[in-house]
Amino acid sequence: MKIYEGVRIMKKLWLLVLFALVLPLGSIMAQGEMVTELGDGEGALDIIAWPGYIERGDTDENYDWVTDFEAETGCIVNVKTAATSDEMVALMNEGVFDLVTASGDASLRLVYGGRVQPVNIDLVPSYSTVDERLQNAPWHTVDVDGDGTPEHYGVPYQWGPNVLMYNTEVFPEAPTSWSVVFEEQTLPDGDSNAGRIQAYDGPIHIADAANYLMFHNPELGITDPYSLNTDQFAAALDLLRQQRALVARYWHDAFVQMDDFTNEGIVASGSWPFQVNLLQAGGAPIASVFPEEGATGWADTTMMHVNAPHPNCSYLWLEHSISPKLQGDLAAWFGSVPAVPAACTGNELLTDAGCSINGFDNFEQIRFWRTPTEDCGDADDSTTCVPYREWVTNYIAVIGGR
């Protein structure tokens, strides 16, 4: 494994999509008209999704929430998986997809960039069953037109934390801190962590560093890992440069990360419950923990392209996506938390303990991904924070050794 592996390719990709990723929040493109009534399905549906989010039983026949939908609606589902939020934004700019399962660090870019349309929740009858903590969440409910009434730009799908995944043969007891991936140290097996850890291959990882500093360096005054002034941002970058000396590979592909834990000697990394579940199912000595510093996380929203070619099938899927059966099955498969609390009981795959295990009660402790902006979100108009475009360019520099 080499730290440089993939860096050159990812730098080229980021540079190609940088313009699309950093549209200023004020440059709103024309928004499409909200759909007011539905017609017959168009026969197809094209979705951009995280790996593991749209399953049709190919990996495990018990996990299939596509086949019955296709039979009932005639809408044939095509899925394009994306490994990062930046890739999702770039794909949505191509304009050939209907829906995207966007995390909070992509959703507002899509809204203010004019890439998604408001959703008429009256056409999604089960919307009222969505967790009240998510129904009007700021990463998808936005007053774009300034009329004082926020519009919904999607339907909540799943949420959860970014966990610390570790090898139980190296860590007989769960590590309590993210320090194992940020600070050089001797691990319980007697060897250094250098060359045995990973970090996420995306600019939003800067928030993980800021979250760590918020706990360990309170003198920096960080209160929100996504709203950083220049000094706080510089401190986070310094920590990431320190981390770079320890990193064997920056990961963005879930399946590559799983192979690295299985075959390449990686023993600790930030990860998703999806990888933890699959590795454990395969018998690997893997577990995960929610460290003392807390964690960043994701609350994903199914959003509809402003020029969706199959709007009727899109709305049929939006309703299907929040059915308790799908929500529970997906949570069991991915290790996430359902957006619909009713899915937490009576699901054979998830079990009645599943939501608690996956973090249902940790909502307030998770610092959910969102797009960093110059507006610090405070009452002081004189303060400015580092916007996402600078997160992108600086993270490229960090992993490139600068």
PLM regions and their residue ranges:
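Conserved C-terminal helix/tail region of periplasmic/extracytoplasmic solute-binding proteins
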Residues: 365-402
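Periplasmic-binding protein-like
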Residues: 126-130, 234-243, 282-306, 351-352
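Paired acidic/hydrophobic, glycine-rich loop segments that form the ligand-binding mouth/hinge
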Residues: 98-102, 250, 267-272, 287-288
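Short, low-complexity disordered leader/linker segments with a strong preference
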Residues: 1-44, 402
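Mature extracytoplasmic/periplasmic domains
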Residues: 295, 300, 305-370
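Extracytoplasmic ligand-binding site segments that recognize negatively charged/polar headgroups
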Residues: 46-60, 104-256
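A ligand-binding cleft/hinge motif common to bilobed small-molecule-binding domains
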Residues: 106-111, 270-285
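Early extracytoplasmic/lumenal segment of secretory-pathway proteins
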Residues: 32-110
